Amino acid sequence: MIIGIGSDLIDITRIAKVIERHGERFLDRIFTETERARAGRRDKQPNLVAATYAKRFAAKEACSKALGTGIRQGVWWRDMGVVNLPGGRPTMALTGGAKARLDALTPAGMIAQIDLSITDEWPLAQAFVVISAIPATAS
């Protein structure tokens, strides 16, 4: 059962300009340590760094839309982070207000599954999030 769907499209150059202007203050406010570490591995190529951050920014926007809140009502930027599953597939890890909202949306006896697709083609980055409720399996 689909709980929510969200999408976002962003101009990578916009994120690059914000990083150039606000630097660490912006990065600390928006991105998790995991996301910053991933972008840091691309530090020799500024366009890749900006694209990495832009995709994650778009993913947070898309996830907040799928949660039905946007970035408000207790759902904040660092409550949502892009992580990779063991096979490399991206998903969202939620904490704080975002996790509380997800828990409130998930019906009893179900668990939430977040599917994420992120891509970029200069100068755009795009993200789609589908949040589904799937039956909990007996342990």
Curated annotation (Swiss-Prot):
Record's Gene3D superfamilies? 4'-phosphopantetheinyl transferase domain (3.90.470.20)
SUPFAM superfamilies tied to this protein:
4'-phosphopantetheinyl transferase
Q: Per the annotation, which location comes first and is thus the protein's main one?
A: cytoplasm
Q: Which UniProt keywords apply?
A: Cytoplasm, Fatty acid biosynthesis, Fatty acid metabolism, Lipid biosynthesis, Lipid metabolism, Magnesium, Metal-binding, Transferase
GO terms assigned for molecular function: holo-[acyl-carrier-protein] synthase activity; magnesium ion binding
The record's catalysed reaction(s) read:
apo-[ACP] + CoA = holo-[ACP] + adenosine 3',5'-bisphosphate + H(+)
Any idea which positions bind Mg(2+)? 8, 61
Where in the cell?
Answer: Cytoplasm
Highest taxon, organism lineage:
Bacteria
Annotated transmembrane regions: none
Q: What is its EC number?
A: 2.7.8.7
Name the UniProt record assigns to this protein: Holo-[acyl-carrier-protein] synthase
